[in-house]
Amino acid sequence: IYYGTKYKDDSAAVRIDRNFDRDRFVSFSFNYTNNWDGYPVVPRDYRYADRFFSGQVNIDSAAGKKHGPINPGFRNKWWYHGVLGDYTTSITRNLDVTWQFKKDHDLPSYVRIFRTRNDYSDAWIKNYTYPNYTPSGNVTPAQIQDWLKTYTGGFSVSSYQERSNGLDFQFGKNIGINNILFGMTVSHDYYRRVNPSARTRASISRNMFTSYLQDKLKIGDNFEITPGLRYIHSDDYTVKNGGGKDISPSDSSVSHLSGMLSTRYKLDDTLSLYASWAQVFRAKRVTDYDATLEPLDDEKGNVYNIGLKKKIGSRTSLDINFSYLKMDNAIGAYSVEDASTATGTKSYAMNASQSKRALNIGIDHRFNENWRLGISYSYVKTHYHAKHFTTVPDGSGTSLDDLLSKQIPMNSYQFDLGYDKGKFSADFLTSIYSGNDENFFTNKRFVVSDLTLNFKITDSTSVYLVGNNLWNTAWENRYYYHMGKGAFPQPGRRFLIGIN
């Protein structure tokens, strides 16, 4: 039995629009979600279930816990947390009000006020006196359930709060061949974390200002070029630790100007070319300062894109696109086991150079008024190079560069066959993921098919049937070093019937 896998999701959304004329309106929206999720977060590894319950899988940090690749069955610890009744929650409350006061040649001008509230919590049972946290002897789930009936120790709840209040402004103006957009955003961001079991807490806040200016120049009927600038400024972070002392990291204040340029040229009615370049810059967020024990650098680099669109006859179209991303610094946190810490893990700052090449080819063809087919191919090649260390610092000798660069399928193919007739429509989509490194995936390739059927009863009502993963393929598109291969499978075969 998968104890602890229950979940509950509640949500509500309200939107009110008041249109004054074709170009002016006021819009109010509020979104609310409340999610409660039990464990486990990964499926059981049945190969090592007996090993886990006989106490051979060490998940206790005090005794030097190890993860999946060098401690088979480690991910079963999350099933154990499900048995104990641990859970996570998330609540979001997002509000915004938008006033569009002008629209000039499809260039909107508006003011938007927003407020976001995100609250997260992790609840862990406080007292692991039975079966002493690490299963030993021949512990059974039933024995643990019996013990829980008499447990009165409660849960240790860690909480995380994210807040952002701000204002967006955009002004659009057409002047001859110039289509100008100017915008800016001011916000105050706040993050708070409380971990009672580790007796730590932190509050981090920051003021941010971003602005952009772009001009789409239409030169004749066939050529357009769009230069643009983006400016970002953020104040020093104010970090308040558990003792109440305020700290402003000396490198946290940021001012940066970046540029972009895009162009499109129409050779004739059937062929057009396009290209773009943009500088990438992302300043450290409030959560970046709290997520790692090591310093992170701002993220920066360049992205280039080139492509063509071609009509072949009256029924076929071709789209080819190539992009290249070159990051001088890509940031992130990388967590590994460290028995010397209270939690048994340590987060390392992952400042790395990154290059990413992607090729996308798509062909759409309509056979007649009823049948159509879309075929696409995507190739992605990513290479990370960590700057501060080359192997995972856990003694396993694993290459960090390989680990980061080979965690997604390299090739993907999609075949989308569609049928439309009167009130009935159908789509049969098959996706093939290949080029998977079997050090990180359970198979070199995965084939997944989905089917969608739709029938329109009236102009406002339709019924539908959706079938996902028709072949019930066991597949995954993610790898996480802690848990080992196959720890994040995608959903199996399922069907959904509904009315719109």
Describe each PLM feature range.
Residues D17-D21, T33, D215, A275, ...:
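Conserved C-terminal beta-signal and adjacent last beta-strands/turns
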Residues Y2-Y3, W79-D86, N94-T98, Y151-S158, ...:
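Extracellular loop and loop/strand-boundary signature of outer-membrane beta-barrel proteins
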Residues G220-D221, I225, Y324-K326, A349-N439, ...:
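Gram-negative outer-membrane beta-barrel transporters
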Residues Y32-W36, R115-D119, I175, V186-R192, ...:
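Transmembrane beta-strands of outer-membrane beta-barrel pores
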Residues I1-S90:
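Periplasmic-side early beta-strands and strand-to-turn transitions of outer-membrane beta-barrels
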Residues I177-L181, T185-S187, R201-M327, R366-N368, ...:
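Structural signature of Gram-negative outer-membrane beta-barrels, strongest in the C-terminal barrel
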Residues N19-T33, G73-W79, V83-G243, K266, ...:
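Face-selective signature of the C-terminal outer-membrane beta-barrel domain
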Residues S109-F114, N118-K126, K266-R282, D298-G374, ...:
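Membrane-embedded beta-barrel scaffold of Gram-negative outer-membrane proteins
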